[in-house]
């Protein structure tokens, strides 16, 4: 039966009018389209003309159909006049077997329907028995009662409550139950309950809660750790040896090496360690500290701790000053060496000859040039500060100076005492 229905649907193209014709042919009644077709063809005999509704379908249809809406007519009614559909829909060439009592009752129209329900009930003949049939039919045709008792019961009707979404309340199945009036059910998404204060919100405040800022013993680190360190009178912070107590802090001396926060960096040389061990007894020696190299066999002494640190980098091979020029990356021990190296990249000429206004990148180049003028040595740089860094000692500075010959002329102010112009040039 299902295969024949699918063939009929494919033949008529799923048109509502064609489906109506096929439904009417099942019931043995005459269709206006089929009658008009037979008249247009000149009295062609219909293969199902001898079938009558009271004889063949007496078991399923005890009463004839009502013809109030003109869609279905009883077997004895006269044929309808021909219409414009005669040529569009030729007669169906197949013959249908006579109806028997063993037909599927799910394909037939329910018995208690009125004439006003004829149009919706026509399509029920093409519908297969579906487990969800009673659900969507009840929602679409609210006035139609459910089908016969042998229709399979949907799986949700097996529950005693009738509605598995409801809280055990007896309601009808499907959409019909939702449309019925009754006590309001609780929503599917109830309002969230109030959680205790232990749960933090999803979007915390940009500032911490007040109870987290209160001081208490539960904090691991003491608050004194975050206090700023004391700054000396000179406004400078302590150096790398800040972990050690400042020198002279307990003596109260004001003229010591680092007493009363002089701002000088601490030193680890043997002399400074000895002065630290002596304490107040060496207060007189702190006025002029001497920093000596502790490397055996060196014994160099410097007046500043920074000079000693620069000297110690020669022993350790440390080169903390790196050239950041592209693809260079050279490292140097002192900052003045790095500065002199960078000028080779920038081509800066900061040393100028006072006589011919020539410029040079290095001071030794200027000194060599000034000897061509018959002058004793390099003049001071125009900017004022020395080219050499603080890390260079006095002995190293003297070693870098060009040697003076014994036959070099005397300074112009002595040789030419009466020429004030040359003396002013050299005194700048």
From Swiss-Prot:
There is a cross-link at residues 55, 227 (Glycyl lysine isopeptide (Lys-Gly) (interchain with G-Cter in ubiquitin)). The gene is Sp7. This is Transcription factor Sp7. PANTHER family: KRUEPPEL-LIKE TRANSCRIPTION FACTOR, TRANSCRIPTION FACTOR SP7. Transcriptional activator essential for osteoblast differentiation. Binds to SP1 and EKLF consensus sequences and to other G/C-rich sequences. The lineage of its organism: Eukaryota, Metazoa, Chordata, Craniata, Vertebrata. Its main location: nucleus. Induction: In response to ascorbic acid induction, expression is activated by NFE2L1 in osteoblasts. Disulfide bonds: none annotated. Residues 30-84, 229-257, 364-428 are annotated as: Disordered. A zinc finger (C2H2-type) spans 291-315, 321-345, 351-373. GO terms for molecular function: DEAD/H-box RNA helicase binding; DNA binding; DNA-binding transcription activator activity, RNA polymerase II-specific; RNA polymerase II cis-regulatory region sequence-specific DNA binding; zinc ion binding. The 9aaTAD motif is a transactivation domain present in a large number of yeast and animal transcription factors. Osteoblast/chondrocyte specific. Belongs to the Sp1 C2H2-type zinc-finger protein family. A motif (9aaTAD) lies at residues 153-161. Gene3D superfamilies: Classic Zinc Finger. One of its GO terms (biological process) is response to insulin. Changing residue 368 to R: Decreased propionylation, leading to increased transcription activator activity. Interacts with RIOX1; the interaction is direct and inhibits transcription activator activity.
